[in-house]
């Protein structure tokens, strides 16, 4: 099994300050504990929240900071009490690497809502050391926060599912939209939004993409399989679509008015916020009162849901649309992501970047 009691060094790319620029960084991994697995990172997706983290947009970043929470790799070492994985398994690691295990959410297997959850980067682990993410050649993770990638699923395709995929799957599951026959809207067609379209279609929904421009109309309808496309500034079309949707998954990660989209919902419809926004959102109360509509939110998903989501995507043939880059391109990728210049998810080929050479 290797030397479990020896700390190992890892090489990643870290931000040092709110400029958000990443550069090579060597740091120490904790020793592989009894319930830990050491993972050699193969691929890691780039999420918009990584931008928030490295640029300290939320005012909580601690540097040096290695981002990356859509991690797929190979198990290279297991602790003595590990029962879920063996050396050689292809596995995934998402946004969480720990929780208290004792609170109400943990006992209900929705540990993403634990008040003592531990983020996979920009947090402090139980040993007092900072956690670092997947833009690195190796990680050590508690087996309870690792999932097995289904056999036959390409690792680079699996990476975005560990955040973008589960972030849309979980609200479908929780709010009862995991059956066919619903009419839904996906607001925003970025990395998360494109997974929303694909998963909703795989569940048998009629899907309308809502965007601020016509730029992605052809892509949405012809390649992603959406049924309709609405431009939010087209007043006539928006009025025609009023009261037509059971739900809207709002993926937009910047401030925007809500009333325009509330008008699209049927009675008892739900506007589900999943974009991380650091400015207040506003609406007038009659917009929800007069249709018994709800504005709610959802945050990633549980480990159990993540396993279900991976199996669902494998069964239905749901894949992510990605652009694979090497680590030395990461700063350019961050700039492009900030400008929405990606179709639809950057995935870093970490192993192919040969960080240790």
UniProtKB/Swiss-Prot annotation:
Pathway given in the UniProt record: Aromatic compound metabolism; phenylpropanoid biosynthesis
Its biological purpose: Involved in lignin biosynthesis. Catalyzes the final step specific for the production of lignin monomers. Catalyzes the NADPH-dependent reduction of coniferaldehyde, 5-hydroxyconiferaldehyde, sinapaldehyde, 4-coumaraldehyde and caffeyl aldehyde to their respective alcohols.
Cofactor binding mode and count: Binds 2 Zn(2+) ions per subunit.
Record-level Gene Ontology MF annotations: cinnamyl-alcohol dehydrogenase activity; coniferyl-alcohol dehydrogenase activity; zinc ion binding
EC number(s) recorded for this UniProt protein: 1.1.1.195
Protein name as catalogued: Probable cinnamyl alcohol dehydrogenase 2
PTM info: The N-terminus is blocked.
SUPFAM superfamilies: GroES-like, NAD(P)-binding Rossmann-fold domains
Lineage: Eukaryota, Viridiplantae, Streptophyta, Embryophyta, Tracheophyta
Binding site for Zn(2+) 1: 47, 69-70, 163
């Amino acid at each position: 099994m290797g030397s479990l009691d020896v700390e190992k060094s890892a090489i990643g790319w870290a931000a040092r300050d709110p400029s958000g620029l990443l550069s090579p960084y060597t740091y120490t991994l904790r020793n592989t504990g009894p319930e830990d697995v050491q993972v050699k990172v193969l691929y890691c997706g780039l999420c918009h929240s990584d931008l928030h983290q490295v640029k300290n947009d939320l005012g909580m970043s601690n540097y040096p900071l290695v981002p990356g929470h859509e991690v797929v790799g190979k198990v290279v070492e297991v602790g003595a009490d590990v029962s879920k994985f063996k050396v050689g398994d292809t596995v995934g690691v998402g946004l969480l690497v720990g929780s208290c295990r004792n609170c109400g959410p943990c006992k209900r297997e929705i540990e993403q809502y634990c008040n003592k959850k531990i983020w996979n980067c920009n947090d402090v682990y139980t040993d007092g050391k900072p956690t670092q993410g997947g833009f690195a050649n190796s990680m050590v993770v508690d087996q309870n926060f690792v999932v097995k990638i289904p056999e036959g699923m390409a690792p680079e395709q699996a990476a975005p599912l560990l955040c973008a995929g589960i972030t849309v799957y979980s609200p479908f599951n929780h709010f009862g939209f995991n059956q066919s026959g619903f009419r839904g809207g996906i607001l925003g067609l970025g990395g998360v939004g494109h997974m929303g379209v694909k998963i909703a279609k795989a569940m048998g929904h009629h899907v309308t993409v809502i965007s601020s421009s016509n730029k992605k109309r052809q892509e949405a309808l012809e390649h992603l399989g959406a049924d309709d496309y609405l431009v939010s500034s087209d007043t006539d079309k928006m009025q025609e679509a009023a009261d037509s949707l059971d739900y809207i998954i709002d993926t937009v990660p910047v401030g925007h008015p809500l009333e325009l989209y509330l008008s699209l919902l049927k009675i008892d419809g739900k506007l589900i916020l999943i974009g991380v926004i650091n400015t207040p959102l506003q609406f007038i109360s009659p917009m929800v009162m007069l249709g018994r509509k709800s504005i709610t939110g959802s945050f990633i998903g549980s480990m159990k849901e993540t396993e279900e989501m991976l199996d669902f995507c494998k069964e239905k043939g749901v894949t992510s649309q990605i652009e694979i880059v090497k680590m030395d391109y990461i700063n350019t990728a961050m700039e492009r992501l900030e400008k929405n210049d990606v179709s639809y998810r950057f995935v870093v080929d970490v192993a192919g970047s040969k960080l240790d050479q």
